[in-house]
Amino acid sequence: MLALFLSSSSYPTLSFLSRSVTLNLARTTTLSALTMSMNLKTHAFAGNPLKSKTPKSTDPFSPTSAFESLKTLIPVIPNHSTPSPDFKVLPFSKGRPLVFSSGGDANTTPIWHLGWVSLADCKVLLASCGVDLNEDSLVYLGPKLEEDLVYWAVDLAEDGFVSELGGRKLCFVELRTLMVAADWADQRAMDELAIAGNARALLEWHNVSQFCGSCGSKTFPKEAGRRKQCSDETCRKRVYPRVDPVVIMLVIDRENDRALLSRQSRYVPRMWSCLAGFIEPGESLEEAVRRETWEETGIEVGDVVYHSSQPWPVGPSSMPCQLMLGFFAFAKTLDINVDKEELEDAQWHSREEVKKALAVAEYRKAQRTAAAKVEQICKGVERSQSLSTDFNLESGELAPMFIPGPFAIAHHLISAWVNQAPDDVHSKQQAGVSLSSL
């Protein structure tokens, strides 16, 4: 269990934000035999191994230096004598990364991998599709110093790229499908998911920021795609990757040991989750939690306690990457008045009800189903990219309710509350307690 301990003896509403955070990996909690038993180091899409350290500008692996090397290699086909560093490229099409699947049989679950290609292969394959590769089309993702490699992403509109790969069985697959198909116990899979999420967010941002918001002129990439700049000489506005902050909160009725869960009309049947909403300009995180809870359910919130955060690059394409900021919020009033324009329903649920929703949802079964779907897509058997996230009991009976899977921060907020003693979440010794062990 990943526990976040805040070293303070009291909880004034604002002071917890400045407390030191210590990672304690010693505690584990098992929900039931039906749930997965594993420890997560980070949320899905966090923990990108390419983002841990950005080299200094003088380093050959830095964005600036790597980009200069890239420009010398683009006009020619690199060969084995290419100087360090080498380059790998991850192609995307319509927000979907290139992947391949391996290892699936009657007894084992297939495993998906990112479909990295060499710079030389990328150029040749794109040329065969009538697409010219240039330095402005590539976005810097980061280096792996131990492998002497720098990683890039490129956005393609041509599905013909895949057919040129021949027998390699690669395909562009929706990131949401890969998210569900990732084995949460496999650090490699979580690392690749984080890399793909970061790449998609950057590429989508480039797609929606092609024109200057100040003067309307075209923008062009700078610093290996890490920012953009207006092409108008009198404007020259700098534009940086967009991140949309969202508060997501589990509202708790401390006196009656209940949690408030809600449904939106777009949810699959029987799924319940936390309240969430975008932060408005000039608003603190705590104020956003209280406002969103009041607007959507009519419930007043008092104390607000931070849990953890998660990048979320699988939202609408108009928002390339949301940052989900998770909180526990403690209710001052209990009467629910649902805003039907925002929610389909909201209800208080007892700890036991929520625990059952965690226990009966076969998250591992969903992961295996999604992994098999990725394999079928890569083989060309399955063409649909849609994926049901509904879960059933092993007996085939429908569970009365379930919550989002371990790939979502909502799962960990809810599971952290379920597995704590009633007073622990708001104890004077710790807050923001855990990414649950599943």
From Swiss-Prot:
Binds 3 Mg(2+) ions per subunit. Binds 1 zinc ion per subunit. Mg(2+) 1 binds at A276, E296, E342. Expressed in roots, leaves, stems and inflorescences. Its cofactor is Mg(2+); Zn(2+). It catalyses: a 5'-end NAD(+)-phospho-ribonucleoside in mRNA + H2O = a 5'-end phospho-adenosine-phospho-ribonucleoside in mRNA + beta-nicotinamide D-ribonucleotide + 2 H(+); NAD(+) + H2O = beta-nicotinamide D-ribonucleotide + AMP + 2 H(+); NADH + H2O = reduced beta-nicotinamide D-ribonucleotide + AMP + 2 H(+). A motif (Microbody targeting signal) lies at residues 422-424. Disruption phenotype: No visible phenotype under normal growth conditions. It is found in: Plastid, Chloroplast. GO terms for cellular component: chloroplast. Residues 1-36 form a transit peptide. It comes from the Eukaryota. InterPro entries: NAD-cap_RNA_hydrolase_NudC (IPR050241), NADH_PPase-like_N (IPR015375), NudC-like_C (IPR049734), Nudix_hydrolase (IPR020476), NUDIX_hydrolase-like_dom_sf (IPR015797), NUDIX_hydrolase_CS (IPR020084), NUDIX_hydrolase_dom (IPR000086), Znr_NADH_PPase (IPR015376). Pfam families: NUDIX (PF00293), NUDIX-like (PF09296), Zn_ribbon_NUD (PF09297). Zn(2+) binds at C212, C215, C230, C235. NCBIfam families: PRK00241.1. This is Nudix hydrolase 19, chloroplastic. It comes from Arabidopsis thaliana (Mouse-ear cress).
